[in-house]
Amino acid sequence: MPAYRSRTTTHGRNMAGARGLWRATGMKDGDFGKPIIAVVNSFTQFVPGHVHLKDLGQLVAREIEAAGGVAKEFNTIAVDDGIAMGHDGMLYSLPSREIIADSVEYMVNAHCADAMVCISNCDKITPGMLMASLRLNIPTVFVSGGPMEAGKVVMHGKKVALDLVDAMVAAADDKISDEDVATIERSACPTCGSCSGMFTANSMNCLTEALGLSLPGNGSTLATHSDRKRLFVEAGHLIVDITRRYYEQDDENVLPRNIASKQAFENAMALDIAMGGSTNTVLHILAAAYEGEIDFNLDDIDQLSRRVPCLSKVAPAKQDVHMEDVHRAGGIMRILGELDRGGLINRDCPTVHAPTLGDAIDRWDITRTNSETVREFFRAAPGGVPTQVAFSQSSRWDELDMDRENGVIRSVEKPFSKDGGLAVLKGNIALDGCIVKTAGVDESILKFTGPAKVYESQDSAVKAILSNEVVAGDVVVIRYEGPKGGPGMQEMLYPTSYLKSKGLGKVCALITDGRFSGGTSGLSIGHVSPEAANGGTIGLVRNGDTIAIDIPNRTIELMLSEGELAARRVSQDAAGWKPAEHRKRKVTTALKAYAAFATSADLGAVRKLPE
């Protein structure tokens, strides 16, 4: 039977000093011996996805204490990728994931906490906490802040649903008036919560459901809806239950590494591919698997991508569909239910809230349950009132979206496409692989060949696109933006958004050793590995070289002979693998420290110490 970790600081005469300090935090005689549960919050006023979390940590803490535990709350940092986008702030986004994971480990291990509830929401916070949970392997429940309501506005007599990406695209489109841009800007992000499409934050919060570490509805219940409060209340009780099961009943099935097994990771990626999630999820899932010592890699994702169809298209892939619509169609449990019918997931994986994922699906899939409570839960609708307050409205749709042929979530027999929403490509320009969000690629350019236009930084590419240097048929290559080369592997949302605003979204391709925002669509291929700074072939591309992309056959090739590539490599080795242009970005000691240990994207861009 494992001993409570917290006994190290709460029991024994020699711990009188530690107990004295615990007493100063409010603990009483009767609290020593109870499980000490860390409430890992990420409240900040910088991020709309986290601005409403301030009181939610204490909501969970009260429920933990009502269930017989001791709750102690602390915060991690949280970077808003949208605000950090398009300038040197984006260099810090991906490295912040490691800082978050480390900070959770530091606090939990320093104070010998027995378990934790992770209150996350946005892009790097959920992955960072997920990495920490698998690293620590103590009982953990995830509950996120929830998605933002989609913006709604009437423009030129037509009601339009909006999100963050619409504001970016409109601002770069010379054909849209200043007045209309201002209207879009003011309407795109109306409430607290993670940005309203199937971007990185919402994708990751959905994946925690498939991994079995969060409650049903975690990924899709709106931040503003009163139904979401139940998830926080239930998380507080649930964590005490599974903590006792582990420490008092020796039930290791409740530990993160036993819940988030390789089979669970396969379930999560099957979901990701089916719902057309952000390409960043690949990076984060690989990193989480690494922390959990789980043998799950890019080849596994490639195999899944070849057999899992695309069952849902959400913004940015389908501009008028947002997370509130996914919830109305049954949320993540409905998508998992459709995959289950097709024999595409493992039903036997345990979860924190049900004996198996299959049991959870049978209870929560709206197409197979008779529970009116479940059906009412998924009728939760947006309130349509701008607010930064959680649980502030209780609107309901009149009916659910149960249409399996033409609805937001479709059946395996009637998918949006037989190929899934994500694909792994390989070829001489990406020997270790690269990623494309196929759900956002127009069918007309699934195969694409064109001349390279090479840029040594995101900034140079943006300048070229806005000055009309890039034309239809081009393959834009942005390099030295990988984990080491950036450093920090910046997101390329601005280049892809500007291509769309220039009318080039369906007639150009973009490849990079950097990564993309979950808001990116179009033929945007990221995570090219090895990256240029590590001697990857992307560093050998020259203007005018022909690049051939074939998504159906999963290939990407630089159309040069082996002899020419070898000659260029000799030349580049002599010159050094660094950008040809002088970049003005300031690379601080903190960023250099990340770059020194960062692995390539195909390994999740995690840090590895030299052996």
Swiss-Prot record:
Keyword Amino-acid biosynthesis attributed: yes
Binding site for Mg(2+): 81, 123-124, 491
Active site: 517
GO molecular function: 2 iron, 2 sulfur cluster binding; dihydroxy-acid dehydratase activity; magnesium ion binding
Claim: Flavoprotein is one of the keywords in the record: no
Reaction it catalyzes: (2R)-2,3-dihydroxy-3-methylbutanoate = 3-methyl-2-oxobutanoate + H2O; (2R,3R)-2,3-dihydroxy-3-methylpentanoate = (S)-3-methyl-2-oxopentanoate + H2O
Pfam families (alphabetical): ILV_EDD_C, ILVD_EDD_N
Pathway connected to this protein: Amino-acid biosynthesis; L-isoleucine biosynthesis; L-isoleucine from 2-oxobutanoate: step 3/4; Amino-acid biosynthesis; L-valine biosynthesis; L-valine from pyruvate: step 3/4
SUPFAM superfamilies for the chain: IlvD/EDD N-terminal domain-like (SSF143975), LeuD/IlvD-like (SSF52016)
Top-level taxonomic group: Bacteria
Keywords assigned: 2Fe-2S, Amino-acid biosynthesis, Branched-chain amino acid biosynthesis, Iron, Iron-sulfur, Lyase, Magnesium, Metal-binding
Cleavable signal peptide: none
EC number: 4.2.1.9
GO cellular component, one term: cytosol
Job description of the protein: Functions in the biosynthesis of branched-chain amino acids. Catalyzes the dehydration of (2R,3R)-2,3-dihydroxy-3-methylpentanoate (2,3-dihydroxy-3-methylvalerate) into 2-oxo-3-methylpentanoate (2-oxo-3-methylvalerate) and of (2R)-2,3-dihydroxy-3-methylbutanoate (2,3-dihydroxyisovalerate) into 2-oxo-3-methylbutanoate (2-oxoisovalerate), the penultimate precursor to L-isoleucine and L-valine, respectively.
HAMAP family hit by this protein: IlvD (MF_00012)
Similarity field: Belongs to the IlvD/Edd family.
Name of this protein: Dihydroxy-acid dehydratase
Organism: Allorhizobium ampelinum (strain ATCC BAA-846 / DSM 112012 / S4) (Agrobacterium vitis (strain S4))
Gene that this sequence comes from: ilvD
